[in-house]
A protein has these predicted regions:
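Short, charge-rich amphipathic alpha-helices with coiled-coil/heptad character
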Residues: 1-55, 127-143
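Short coil/loop "hinge" linkers that interrupt or connect long alpha-helical coiled-coils or helical hairpins
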Residues: 4-7, 11, 62-100
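Non-transmembrane amphipathic alpha-helical segments
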Residues: 19-22, 29, 43, 50, ...
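Alpha-helical coiled-coil
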Residues: 32-84
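Long amphipathic alpha-helical coiled-coil segments
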Residues: 73-74, 108-133
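Coiled-coil termination/hinge junctions
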Residues: 140-161
């Protein structure tokens, strides 16, 4: 038979150990919740950066398109001036400008095609990243709810102990 005093001390020691474990867990849970929030924020920022880069590609493509339109307008002006000129030197100079502008247009259109391909890939990447982000946010929401529920349970256990 165990002495009643020793038995009471063992029960007290068990409660103290339980209280210490619950207190440690209760202190850890807010950090775990914050870590979930931080991960959601980091993934959201990464997604936003991908969207921004994709939008920038489209903006660059539109700028090139405007440059092409500008060059085409310049070619039309040069051709109009060419019809009005009477000197061979002026005609040749305008012809050279037209050829130069046409080469620039070809280079710009090549760049525009590359940007269109990059934009299409960017849109696909954004769509995929959005699906992944939404799935992660849903998973994180459940994990956070579980952690908060666990924190409430630990608090209740701590009060009961």
């Amino acid at each position: 038979m165990i002495n009643p005093t020793v038995e009471a001390l063992l029960v007290l020691q068990e409660r103290d150990t339980r209280v210490a474990a619950l207190t440690a867990e209760l202190q850890l849970l807010p950090r775990q919740i914050a870590a979930v929030d931080d991960e959601v924020a980091a993934r959201t920022a990464k997604f936003d950066e991908l969207k921004t880069r994709t939008r920038q590609i489209e903006a660059d493509r539109k700028k090139i398109d405007l440059d092409v339109q500008s060059k085409n307008a310049a070619i039309a002006r040069y051709k109009s001036q060419q019809q009005q000129t009477r000197k061979n030197e002026e005609f040749a100079a305008l012809n050279h400008e037209i050829e130069h502008a046409e080469k620039e247009i070809a280079a710009l259109e090549d760049s525009e095609l590359e940007l269109m391909e990059a934009y299409d890939k960017g849109l696909a990447a954004v769509a995929e990243a959005q699906k992944e982000l939404l799935a992660f946010q849903e998973k994180a929401k459940h994990k956070k709810a579980d952690l908060e529920k666990r924190a409430a349970g630990v608090s209740a256990d701590l009060i009961a102990a």
